[in-house]
Amino acid sequence: MAKAYDHLFKLLLIGDSGVGKTCLIIRFAEDSFNNTYISTIGIDFKIRTVDVEGKKIKLQVWDTAGQERFKTITTAYYRGAMGIILVYDITDEKSFENIQNWMKSIKENASAGVERLLLGNKCDMEAKRKVQKEQAIKLAREHGIRFFETSAKSSTNVDEAFSSLARDILLKSGGRRSGNSHKAPGTDLKPCDKKNTSKCSLG
């Protein structure tokens, strides 16, 4: 019987409360969007298998929604994480400023060399933008990581972001060729759909 997957990667989403972490996970794992989640309740984790570089990668994506204030609880989640996605809300400048604190948290708690990815969520709310894309690109380049602007509501760049992180983990682990698959840090793939408006405020 064929194996269901070649690799299992544990991913973790961190960031301030209300930036849309749970919505991103639900969009990625179930391709659905619901803005009625209760902000203090996380979903633990969701699983989705993706094809990357000819390999079946099972992604176990952990949510930390509602636990941002309990640093010790969140610390336990770092254990075993191979990739960490830092999420901010493009309409909330404070959530972007706090990315530096989350970077520090990764350094203190996560495994050395863990892959990281920066996501600016809710990019469908362009009219309410407070964080310019150039600011995020600069930050991503300073840390040598990739950056995407996403929308859990319109699904923009969600699959691309998760697959990109999975590919980086795979290549780093020597699971496949390491040629030109890497995209320069600080870039995203496609512009966000500005027609939709996001109401998801959950972690």
UniProtKB/Swiss-Prot annotation:
PTM annotation (Phosphoserine): residues: S178
EC number from the UniProt entry: 3.6.5.2
Lipidation (S-geranylgeranyl cysteine): C200
Region (Disordered): 173-203
Positions of transmembrane segments: none
Cross-link Glycyl lysine isopeptide (Lys-Gly) (interchain with G-Cter in ubiquitin) per UniProt, renumbered positions: K46, K58
Chemical reaction(s) catalysed: GTP + H2O = GDP + phosphate + H(+)
Motif Switch 2 positions after renumbering to this chain: 63-80
Molecular functions per Gene Ontology: GTP binding; GTPase activity
Free-text note on domains in this protein's UniProt record: Switch 1, switch 2 and the interswitch regions are characteristic of Rab GTPases and mediate the interactions with Rab downstream effectors. The switch regions undergo conformational changes upon nucleotide binding which drive interaction with specific sets of effector proteins, with most effectors only binding to GTP-bound Rab.
Family classification: Belongs to the small GTPase superfamily. Rab family.
Subunit structure: Interacts (GTP-bound form) with MICALL2; competes with RAB8A and is involved in tight junctions assembly. Interacts (GTP-bound form) with MICALL1. Interacts (GTP-bound form) with MICAL1, MICAL3, MICALCL, EHBP1 and EHBP1L1; ternary complexes of RAB8A, RAB13 and either MICAL1 or EHBP1L1 are possible. Interacts with PRKACA; downstream effector of RAB13 involved in tight junction assembly. Interacts with GRB2; may recruit RAB13 to the leading edge of migrating endothelial cells where it can activate RHOA. Interacts (isoprenylated form) with PDE6D; dissociates RAB13 from membranes.
Record function comment: The small GTPases Rab are key regulators of intracellular membrane trafficking, from the formation of transport vesicles to their fusion with membranes. Rabs cycle between an inactive GDP-bound form and an active GTP-bound form that is able to recruit to membranes different sets of downstream effectors directly responsible for vesicle formation, movement, tethering and fusion. RAB13 is involved in endocytic recycling and regulates the transport to the plasma membrane of transmembrane proteins like the tight junction protein OCLN/occludin.
The protein's name in its UniProt record: Ras-related protein Rab-13
